[in-house]
Amino acid sequence: AGKVILESGMIKSVRHISFINIRLSHQVKGCCKKVLPYIINGNETFHTLIISPPRCGKTTLLRDMIRMLSDGFPGFKGNTIGVVDERSEIGACYKGVPQNDIGIRTDILDCCPKSYGMLMLIRSMSPQIIAVDEIGSRDDIDAIYSVINCGCKLIATVHGNSIDDIRNRPGLRKLVDERVFERYIVLSNRKRTGEIRTIFDDRGSVLFMAEDERLTSAYENEAAVAELS
């Protein structure tokens, strides 16, 4: 943190640095096993959106989903996956080589803007699945429509506490209303980081709900289902 220097309306650098936040990417292998039965159909994957506040494990979950869907597992043949890693948080690449295990059938574009990277992968890498972290901009939304209309499956993450939060953001609301995503995974850290609260389908049906969620958030979930229906 410090003083941000602008040039022609764009951020050029930061001076008078007062604090440094060092983030270390790490893996939790196997953390996605609970959600896999809800996001696959035969040997295909549903368009999936992971919803989570900061520091609740959405990138960690996404990374492990990429690894397992790429490698494959009993009953599921591995898929080719293209990853756009805009902030180097998924693969933690060094000189283009992922330091995290993201699967044997995974291609990664490191430090590439998501909107450009998704289109590049479609045109040149023939992925079955495209995975991106933290969508939200108008350019991201436009690229997402290109992905889903070319036969690729999409797995993405977004900041938020619930589906209601997503619907309050105009670009993302359109994705929900048009049922672009077929699965919604909502995370929290009430008990532990990466806790899976609920999993919805595109019609608003609850496929999974944590036991404590049934008691503490029943009204919230009913409202979310009503909004999607």
Explain the meaning of each model-derived region.
Residues 1-45:
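P-loop NTP-binding catalytic core
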Residues 3-16, 183-229:
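Conserved P-loop NTPase
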Residues 29-34, 108-116, 135:
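A general structural motif
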Residues 70-119:
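P-loop NTPase switch/communication element
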Residues 125-185, 189:
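Conserved P-loop NTPase nucleotide-binding/switch module
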